[in-house]
Amino acid sequence: MLSRPKPGESEVDLLHFQSQFLAAGAAPAVQLVKKGNRGGGDANSDRPPLQDHRDVVMLDNLPDLPPALVPSPPKRARPSPGHCLPEDEDPEERLRRHDQHITAVLTKIIERDTSSVAVNLPVPSGVAFPAVFLRSRDTQGKSATSGKRSIFAQEIAARRIAEAKGPSVGEVVPNVGPPEGAVTCETPTPRNQGCQLPGSSHSFQGPNLVTGKGLRDQEAEQEAQTIHEENIARLQAMAPEEILQEQQRLLAQLDPSLVAFLRSHSHTQEQTGETASEEQRPGGPSANVTKEEPLMSAFASEPRKRDKLEPEAPALALPVTPQKEWLHMDTVELEKLHWTQDLPPVRRQQTQERMQARFSLQGELLAPDVDLPTHLGLHHHGEEAERAGYSLQELFHLTRSQVSQQRALALHVLAQVISRAQAGEFGDRLAGSVLSLLLDAGFLFLLRFSLDDRVDGVIATAIRALRALLVAPGDEELLDSTFSWYHGALTFPLMPSQEDKEDEDEDEECPAGKAKRKSPEEESRPPPDLARHDVIKGLLATSLLPRLRYVLEVTYPGPAVVLDILAVLIRLARHSLESATRVLECPRLIETIVREFLPTSWSPVGAGPTPSLYKVPCATAMKLLRVLASAGRNIAARLLSSFDLRSRLCRIIAEAPQELALPPEEAEMLSTEALRLWAVAASYGQGGYLYRELYPVLMRALQVVPRELSTHPPQPLSMQRIASLLTLLTQLTLAAGSTPAETISDSAEASLSATPSLVTWTQVSGLQPLVEPCLRQTLKLLSRPEMWRAVGPVPVACLLFLGAYYQAWSQQPSSCPEDWLQDMQRLSEELLLPLLSQPTLGSLWDSLRHCSLLCNPLSCVPALEAPPSLVSLGCSGGCPRLSLAGSASPFPFLTALLSLLNTLAQIHKGLCGQLAAILAAPGLQNYFLQCVAPGAAPHLTPFSAWALRHEYHLQYLALALAQKAAALQPLPATHAALYHGMALALLSRLLPGSEYLTHELLLSCVFRLEFLPERTSGGPEAADFSDQLSLGSSRVPRCGQGTLLAQACQDLPSIRNCYLTHCSPARASLLASQALHRGELQRVPTLLLPMPTEPLLPTDWPFLPLIRLYHRASDTPSGLSPTDTMGTAMRVLQWVLVLESWRPQALWAVPPAARLARLMCVFLVDSELFRESPVQHLVAALLAQLCQPQVLPNLNLDCRLPGLTSFPDLYANFLDHFEAVSFGDHLFGALVLLPLQRRFSVTLRLALFGEHVGALRALSLPLTQLPVSLECYTVPPEDNLALLQLYFRTLVTGALRPRWCPVLYAVAVAHVNSFIFSQDPQSSDEVKAARRSMLQKTWLLADEGLRQHLLHYKLPNSTLPEGFELYSQLPPLRQHYLQRLTSTVLQNGVSET
């Protein structure tokens, strides 16, 4: 016998052993047998077995236990010589089919045949879910005693016991109730035939419920037959009455649903038996059960009785007739088919009641009474099923469906609804805002949860809905189209301006402390709370950015989803610097976008839909980087240095758009966005190294511009690309002109400084000859409005480039001034002066008023769909043609033209007069007149703030040009006054980000003598003459108003310094704004402007130094320096007097009551300031202005005043100060008396006569110096009983005397006299008793003079010493009334006072 192979033997040895074994011819250790026929049977017994030579190994010592579940080793198919495999059959499949391993058997599961098994229908139930299984205490006790058995096993055992106990009842119920007396069935088996007992006419079928299932095979049938025979014997022994009685008892004990199920089960079997018996009737006997008829009738009568008690439901008109042969239609349940009947007609709305809004699948708002066909899929089984469409509540419910298609459909419809709502399609047809309703309902977080779905379709639809919610259509188009305007790259952050309620309540807290307290609180606030005030912050708090990065990086969505994600990211970046930083710092987000959507090499992409945006340059991705770079210079530097944008910019800009192997529109937009990104980086002085590399490319692009401008019609995308190219060259020219920053001591300014620019002047000096022809070519189209609007941004960018070019040229120390002066002269004579004389330019000036937001404030109404937590510009419907951002707007071109003229006039003084002739255009004059006229200011919204900023640029540049012209030659008086009024109006309107313009207006325009022509045209003299007319001969002469105005004009430089000290913006913001407007690129921190919550200066800015002086005095108990106090107060009063006299429209926004409150602050600042003679004269002149007949009716002290919490509180403080330090000062007393007029609140008079009675002795202002008429205090009669009693008490006690307080003495006497002689029958009993008592006490007064005044008062007359006239004899009515009262007093007596 050969030995087994050993471990050291090789394959050659094994082959040698095999050859020896075959040569020896020894018997093998195994026996080979033929495999039997697997499909054996009688049918195939006569066929010879197939010649299958497959060997089967039969081991002798086969173990008893089955082998372990280990996968069999892989087998190789080896066809036998006699049986070749078919060519189309897989060998592995054939091997798998013959596999006998246990694993193959276990995995091959064949269901058993259930065709002959009876199907038991589920038990009908009135509840939606099965009853919850509750373990009783008995069950728990039993389970504890009997081994460890599961709850399921115990329940099954209990059911078996219950089934075993109830066979007798089960035999009765299914065997009764046939519809007829005789029922045929199948031929009984011998076992069933033996069940008929002798001597009985009853015959029973076999058991239907007790089948023996669960017992052993040999015992199941025998046990079931035994139970059946016992049941038959028991029934035979009972009388029919006993059977019916037992039946009723069992029915009462059983569940009605179980009985109904058993009946239906029996009825089904009987129907089956009838069918079978009819087929076998010729050869089969019939079984008669005529004696069971009473039993059947008892069962059948009960449902009939029940049917009589219950009213019949109306028959449903089904669209089709159900057939019994249909699946599950053997028993028709009409209530479940109720939904298939026709819908009722739509109810017509008879009232104006609000109804729930319903929308179509395209988001359209459906009318309440619209009748649509059902095949549109707009009807459902909810409330108001006859109405088509889905409500928002139903759509929300559908988003929680388990079916992904339904979730996607609901999100799609909601996205369509949002898009249409933002487009303004719903208008006023809906009550309230759809966006606000959705946000309040939690739609934001519904979208966020949908982004975490596992289905790509749901994710795509959720992203689409998120874009529809966040990205307002039209906003990005507006900002892109105005990128090349004057400072068009600067934008306001799109974030809510409202603060938390706690911050609003703590406005007095210092900003540093507020910031320290706010940041940890904001970090701990949950996302829903954040989203209630700011949607973007709430979204960022939910880890939105990592999820969007995952979708882009892992799921590889389609082009639409990619564009939606990029649009959402752009909206997040526009929110604030913080949001842009979070987008930049999200791990792998920007890396994925740059790698996948901004590659340096790609396959050519043809026109038409793109299957995928991956590895293809995308203009939207480039725009995202541009928006991120606009948020701050640090972000721009990180983008350029960390993501290899240099190679990508070079790759895209180096080729013309036609050569980028992309669709034409995408190539144009991609090239435009690349140029804009470079321009933004150049705005910080970065990216200069690219200019040296791409200089030939830029020169070639500039040379092609005239040919592109000559195409008809001009392509809008090409015009935007050309404008972006010129904007880039403008920034590079400014970078070349900027000088290295000097050593700066201020840390705020040092932080803005950077390394010098890498672009030199010699590299940009050759650009002007290429740009100027482009400007000339576009200006020829000015007379053709359609062509002019098509090339709109190009001439604007050309003008801005020329301004930057000459500004940088004049700053070069190595250049000769004569060269650039001669070039400016040439440009002015050849281009600008002919342009200024063109009539078409005058039409542009005339259209300013029609496109102005200031002249049309109603055109900027907040959008209906503008929730405060989600800010947008609201340009969904597009801008009208005649609007500031419309296609026919003259603002961008005229602003750029004024910018160039200002630059030339600043450098070349000799051109100033010629260029300033543009200011005499009638359209500009009319525009200024309408802007200066008093009127309602536009409501400050995100769009109005953006539009007003551009409008203010034009106004400032026009005023700057006028100021330069006025410094060289006098302006016409009317023009100078108009420019000054425009400067004053603009100063109070400038928004954050224009701090430099505010400072320049204060420095050069507002306090310029040339803008006050009244000083040389008789203005002071006219004021003196007006004083003489108003004073009259009876008034005491004082310092003339004309003298004060002349002195103010002389002190104008000091006044300017005072306001520059107190009204200049913060230094850091001023430096940032200055760097932007001066082109100092190395100091520009960001292109994102501050939040436009309110204008930089308040409307009452002329009083601002005085208000700050008052607050400093309140915070400094020791007092302020007399010199500073006197100087500041005097300069403010002088300037306010100038405005009140010559520019009253400048103070139109400040109510007279607010001006009075500011004048009171002069007396509250210091105890000695009001005694100074200049202050006395100025306050007296301003008080006279407030008391003019045309101003006094507008004095309202009861309304809310800006900057003042409560006027009564201020007046109480004023009375305290007057009582302490006035010493009877007449001017002080006049200010105390002015709020005591009868038409003002009684609270002010009660404060004086109730709490400050001692001040009455110091109010010695003569009647002749009272600034208003005495009738203002006496008419109408006083009706406040408490005040009348105070009047009477002060008169009787002597606290109010004519020599101490002549004015209020006359007032008190007048009101008391009117009260005691009043005979109003509608007066209350309390008033009548007080009147009678006061008259009685007056009659008994010991002071004869006071008694005479109170009883004989007639009319007020300030010319008399007493201030009123007296009756020589009382009128008869008063005399009779007094006599009747005094007779009653003499009879009854009166108590002493």
Swiss-Prot record:
**Entry-linked Pfam families:** RPAP1_C, RPAP1_N
Under InterPro entries, the record lists: RNA_pol_II_AP1_C, RNA_pol_II_AP1_N, RPAP1/Rba50
What superkingdom heads the lineage?
Answer: Eukaryota
Instruction: List where in the cell it is found.
Output: Nucleus
Residues found modified as Phosphothreonine: 321
Task: Give the compositionally biased regions (Pro residues).
Answer: 64-74
Predominantly, its location class is nucleus
Start-end of Acidic residues biased regions? 500-510
**Spans annotated as Disordered:** 34-53, 61-94, 266-295, 496-531
The record's GO molecular-function terms, alphabetically, read: DNA binding; nucleotidyltransferase activity
Q: Which UniProt keywords apply?
A: DNA-binding, DNA-directed RNA polymerase, Nucleotidyltransferase, Nucleus, Phosphoprotein, Transcription, Transferase
Protein function: Forms an interface between the RNA polymerase II enzyme and chaperone/scaffolding protein, suggesting that it is required to connect RNA polymerase II to regulators of protein complex formation. Required for interaction of the RNA polymerase II complex with acetylated histone H3.
The family note in this entry says: Belongs to the RPAP1 family.
Q: What is this protein called?
A: RNA polymerase II-associated protein 1
